């Protein structure tokens, strides 16, 4: 994707929020994707939820809500969007789906896991 003058203009307010974290040379790589994702988000009536640990370009660039897992679940339950995109881990996307069973919930990275959630076993819960 190309870093065009239009992309520069429309994403400049976002870059101002994250310029201390991301060098301008890297921004020129991320900005076209941020621009395209934000356009698609409007076209598809999508809500992007991002966990606090996401990278600056996701957290500030495309997320409608950036918060902890509980706050994201609450936001998922209140949305009027047709599509929920969870930038987080499996259990967060599963929780968003439970809160909104009639909505489509997407998890962009199927490999995203939580070491804490993975470390608990059924035996641990029964104790």
Residue map of PLM features:
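Active-site loop-to-helix "anion-binding N-cap" substructures in soluble metabolic enzymes
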Residues: 2-127
């Amino acid at each position: 994707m190309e870093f065009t003058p239009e992309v520069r203009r429309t994403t400049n307010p976002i870059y101002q929020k994250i310029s201390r974290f991301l060098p301008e040379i890297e921004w020129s790589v991320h900005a076209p994707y941020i621009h395209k994702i934000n356009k698609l988000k409007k076209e598809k009536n999508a809500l992007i939820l991002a966990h606090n640990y996401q990278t600056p370009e996701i957290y500030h660039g495309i997320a409608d809500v950036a918060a902890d897992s509980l706050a994201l679940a609450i936001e998922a339950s209140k949305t009027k969007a047709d599509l929920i995109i969870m930038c987080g881990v499996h259990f967060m996307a599963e929780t968003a789906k439970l809160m909104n069973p009639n909505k489509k919930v997407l998890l962009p990275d199927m490999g995203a896991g939580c070491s804490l959630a993975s470390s608990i076993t059924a035996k641990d819960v029964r104790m």
